[in-house]
Amino acid sequence: MGNRAGRSDFEWVYTDQPHTQRRKEMLAKYPAIKALMRPDPYLKWTVTAMVLAQLLACWLAQGLAWRWLFFWAYAFGGCVNHSLTLAIHDISHNTAFGTGRPSRNRWFAIFANLPVGLPYAASFKKYHVDHHRYLGGDGLDVDVPTYFEGRLFCTPARKLLWLALQPFFYTLRPLCVHPKAMTRMELCNTLVQLAADATIYALWGLKPMVYLLASSLLGLGLHPISGHFVAEHYMFLKGHETYSYYGPLNWITFNVGYHMEHHDFPSIPSCNLPLVRKIAPEYYDHLPQHHSWVKVLWDFVFDDSLGPFARVKRVCKLAENRL
């Protein structure tokens, strides 16, 4: 468990991200793809059902022994809360109510945030725009680990710890890499979340709040669904910086596995991403792809060529001009 990862730096490239050019080519060849850029009519109902399910779980958690509370937080709540963060990801692209109603999408994301226990939705949207616009951009894309992470988490045991601590790194990294001023929506997100947490605590006590927070921390940490964090952009094959996953867990994660398709067309809702591949299979079928997030996690931990440094990075124009 002590072998160090083989990489000592990121994979620096001097080309633009590939998705912009792919998008232009595909739209020119398949204009029917534009018809997929419409709101998901079922997203709001699915998310509402998930939020209500977690509220019911909170009520049930009052009578659970602590060991069972943490078991169900991992086995059930972790799946639901992780999936809700992926719903928030989808909503951040205005797929719940359409691009013409950005305010409704923002407030609905805050509603979806409620079972997560901590304010997340507004901050995620603020930084996720840069992830698409400046994929791998040095100092801009906060999805890319820091040098500190790459140098410290370089052995199997440390990489395992890094995976378990993903919620903390995703929270703290933006503050270190690309700090931004707090927005009004972030303040609203925080106030609404605190009010919801206080209400749950007042009604049902401590255990439901512990259940929700444990669901988020465990579900976003060392959990099978968390394989998507690594599968999406970690360089399993040199020259490829985005990968899709075509496995069964897409059914409960809003098709987040269709990640190549998503970066090619961010405005297409998750429910329509499989149709992109169906319309233009020659753009996807030959690319390297994943079929098991558990295997992704296993390979990441035990393959010396993989680690936090196994990411493509580039210097973007905005980064050059920031000073």
UniProtKB/Swiss-Prot annotation:
Region feature (Required for C4-hydroxylase activity): 95-99
Keywords: Endoplasmic reticulum, Lipid biosynthesis, Lipid metabolism, Lipoprotein, Membrane, Myristate, Oxidoreductase, Transmembrane, Transmembrane helix
Motif Histidine box-2 in this chain: 128-132
Reactions catalysed according to its record: a dihydroceramide + 2 Fe(II)-[cytochrome b5] + O2 + 2 H(+) = a phytoceramide + 2 Fe(III)-[cytochrome b5] + H2O; an N-acylsphinganine + 2 Fe(II)-[cytochrome b5] + O2 + 2 H(+) = an N-acylsphing-4-enine + 2 Fe(III)-[cytochrome b5] + 2 H2O; N-octanoylsphinganine + 2 Fe(II)-[cytochrome b5] + O2 + 2 H(+) = N-octanoyl-4-hydroxysphinganine + 2 Fe(III)-[cytochrome b5] + H2O; an N-acylsphinganine + 2 Fe(II)-[cytochrome b5] + O2 + 2 H(+) = an N-acyl-(4R)-4-hydroxysphinganine + 2 Fe(III)-[cytochrome b5] + H2O
Main subcellular location: endoplasmic reticulum
Gene Ontology molecular-function annotations: sphingolipid C4-monooxygenase activity; sphingolipid delta-4 desaturase activity
Compartment(s) of residence: Endoplasmic reticulum membrane
Any one of the GO CC terms: endoplasmic reticulum membrane
Chain location of the short sequence motif Histidine box-3 per the record: 259-263
Residue positions bearing lipid (N-myristoyl glycine): 2
A family per Pfam: Lipid_DES
Involved pathway(s): Membrane lipid metabolism; sphingolipid biosynthesis
Motif Histidine box-1 per UniProt: ranges: 89-93
BP terms from Gene Ontology: ceramide biosynthetic process; sphinganine metabolic process
Transmembrane segment boundaries: 45-65, 68-88, 209-231
Homology family: Belongs to the fatty acid desaturase type 1 family. DEGS subfamily.
Primary role: Bifunctional enzyme which acts both as a sphingolipid delta(4)-desaturase and a sphingolipid C4-monooxygenase.
Name of the molecule in the record: Sphingolipid delta(4)-desaturase/C4-monooxygenase DES2
Organism of origin: Bos taurus (Bovine)
Underlying gene: DEGS2
